[in-house]
Design a protein with these regions (language model features):
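Alpha-helical membrane-protein architecture signal
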Residues: 1, 5-9, 185, 224-237, ...
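Extracytoplasmic/periplasmic domains immediately adjacent to an N-terminal transmembrane anchor
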Residues: 1-183, 352, 376-398
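Membrane-spanning alpha-helical segments of multipass transporters and channels
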Residues: 57, 241, 245, 261-398
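Hydrophobic alpha-helical transmembrane segments
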Residues: 127-144, 177-188, 192, 210-222, ...
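Long, hydrophobic alpha-helical segments
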Residues: 188-206
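Juxtamembrane interface at the cytosolic side of transmembrane helices
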Residues: 200-232, 236, 380-381
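Membrane-interfacial helix-loop-helix connectors in multipass membrane proteins
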Residues: 215-220, 253-269
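Selective transmembrane-helix segments that form parts of the transport pathway or gating/packing helices
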Residues: 226-253, 357, 361, 365
C-alpha cells in the first residue's frame, strides 16, 4: 500500500512538472472552447455581400432590390453599371452572389415575355454560397408569386382563386433537428470532442515512451512490474481525472453559449467516460510500442488530425470509399461523434446510442489488451537489458 501511494504521488508529480503536458491538457481545451464558441456565436451567417446590378431601374425592378435588402442574410451592394470584369469584383468584395436584373425587365413582365434574372453564386465557399442561394431563392420566389397573383387578380380572380391557381398543392417543410439551423449547435460540441481526443492522445503519447527512458522506472515499479494492468492504470489515472475537468469546462462554456444539453446526463457521461478510456488506451498502445516520444506523437497525430473530417459527422460515410470507412471505425472519435449528435443535436432516444457505446467499449478493450501484451513484453525486455531477475523487488520508498 505504501508503494502504491508512492507510485501515485510520483505519477502526479511527473504530470504537474511537465509544462508541455500542462499547457496541452489545461490551456488548449479552454482556449479552443472559447475560440470556437465566439467564432460560431451568431449561429448563422448574416450580411453576406451580394452584388445587385439593376439594368432596368423601374419600380418593379427596384421592388426586387428592396426585398433583397430586407433579407437579413444578405447585404446588398448596388451597382448601376456592370463591372468590366465581374469575377474580379466578386473576389474584391467577397460577394456570395451576383444578381443581374436585365433591361426592360418590367416591360417584358407586363407583356408576359418572361424575362430572366441571372444569379451567379460564388461557390468558392460552399457554406456562404448555400446561405446566399437560399435567401435569394426565397426572395425571388416570393416576388414571383406575388407578381403572378396580381396578374390573375387583374383578370377578375379573387385572392384565394389566384393563390390556388399558382399553387395547386402545398408542400410543408418541417425541420426536425436544430430547427434554427444554428451552426454553433451543430459544430461546437463535435469540435470539443475532437479537442478532448487530441489532448488525450498528446498526453498519452509521451507517457510510456518517456517513462522507459528513465532509469528509475524499474526501481520505482519494483514489486508491481508483474502487474501490467496496475502499471497502466497508474499511468492513465491523471489523464482520466483531468479529462473530467475538461468536460466540466466544456459544460460551463456550453451554458455560456446557450448550447442545448443532453436530456439524459447519465447516458452522456457514461458514453463520454468510455470514449475517454478508449482514446487513452489507444494512446497507451502507441506509446508503449513506439519508444520515441516524438514518433509516438507523430503517429497519434496522423490518426487524430483527419479524424473529424473522415468521421462522417459532416461528410457522410456512405459517400466515402469503403477502405476509409473501415479505417474510421478504429478511431474512438467516430462512434462518439455519432452518439453525440444523437444526444445533443437530434435529442434521440437513449437506445439509439447503445451501438456506439458498445463500439467504444470494444475499441477500449481491444486497445487495452494489445497495450497490456505490449507492456508485458516491454517490461521483460527492460529487465533483460538491465540484467535483472523478474523477481527483483526494491522496497526503498519514501
Amino acid at each position: 500500500m505504501k508503494q502504491l501511494r508512492y507510485l501515485l504521488k510520483r505519477e502526479f508529480h511527473l504530470f504537474f512538472t511537465n509544462k508541455t503536458m500542462l499547457s496541452v491538457f489545461f490551456m488548449a481545451p479552454i482556449f479552443y472552447a472559447l475560440l470556437l464558441g465566439f467564432t460560431y456565436e451568431k449561429g448563422k451567417v448574416t450580411d453576406i455581400p451580394v452584388i445587385v446590378i439593376n439594368h432596368d431601374q423601374t419600380p418593379l425592378s427596384n421592388q426586387i432590390v428592396d426585398m433583397l435588402e430586407d433579407n437579413q442574410t444578405l447585404k446588398v451592394l448596388n451597382y448601376v453599371e456592370e463591372p468590366a470584369i465581374l469575377k474580379d469584383e466578386v473576389i474584391k468584395t467577397e460577394a456570395g452572389a451576383v444578381v443581374i436584373i436585365p433591361e426592360r425587365f418590367e416591360a417584358n413582365m407586363l407583356q408576359k415575355k418572361y424575362p430572366e434574372i441571372n444569379v451567379y453564386l460564388n461557390t468558392s465557399n460552399v457554406l456562404t454560397a448555400n446561405f446566399a442561394s437560399k435567401a435569394i431563392q426565397l426572395t425571388l420566389g416570393t416576388f414571383s408569386a406575388g407578381a403572378e397573383m396580381k396578374a390573375l387578380q387583374k383578370k377578375g380572380m379573387n385572392a384565394d382563386q389566384a393563390k390556388a391557381n399558382i399553387e395547386p398543392y402545398k408542400a410543408n417543410y418541417i425541420t426536425l433537428f436544430n430547427t434554427t439551423s444554428n451552426y454553433l449547435i451543430f459544430m461546437w460540441p463535435a469540435m470539443m470532442a475532437v479537442v478532448l481526443q487530441q489532448v488525450i492522445l498528446l498526453a498519452m503519447a509521451v507517457t510510456f515512451s518517456e517513462e522507459f527512458k528513465r532509469d528509475s522506472f524499474i526501481k520505482d515499479f519494483a514489486g508491481k512490474h508483474k502487474y501490467a494492468i496496475l502499471v497502466m492504470a497508474i499511468k492513465c489515472l491523471p489523464v482520466w481525472i483531468f479529462s473530467n475537468l475538461n468536460i466540466l469546462v466544456f459544460y460551463l462554456c456550453s451554458l455560456y453559449f446557450k448550447i442545448p444539453l443532453p436530456e439524459n446526463a447519465m447516458n452522456f457521461f457514461l458514453i463520454t467516460a468510455i470514449f475517454v478510456v478508449a482514446a487513452t488506451n489507444l494512446g497507451v498502445l502507441v506509446s508503449i510500442m513506439v519508444p520515441d516520444a516524438l514518433k509516438a506523437t507523430q503517429i497519434l497525430m496522423v490518426i487524430a488530425s483527419p479524424a473529424f473530417i473522415i468521421s462522417g459527422f459532416t461528410w457522410p460515410n456512405y459517400a466515402m470509399p469503403d477502405f476509409i470507412t473501415y479505417f474510421t471505425k478504429i478511431i474512438p472519435l467516430t462512434p462518439y461523434l455519432e452518439a453525440l449528435k444523437i444526444m445533443v443535436v437530434e435529442k434521440g432516444s437513449d437506445y439509439l446510442t447503445q451501438k456506439y457505446f458498445w463500439h467504444l467499449f470494444i475499441l477500449g478493450w481491444v486497445y487495452f489488451l494489445l497495450g497490456w501484451i505490449a507492456l508485458k513484453i516491454k517490461i521483460k525486455m527492460l529487465f533483460k537489458e538491465y540484467h535483472l531477475s523478474e523477481d527483483y523487488d526494491d522496497q526503498r520508498f519514501v
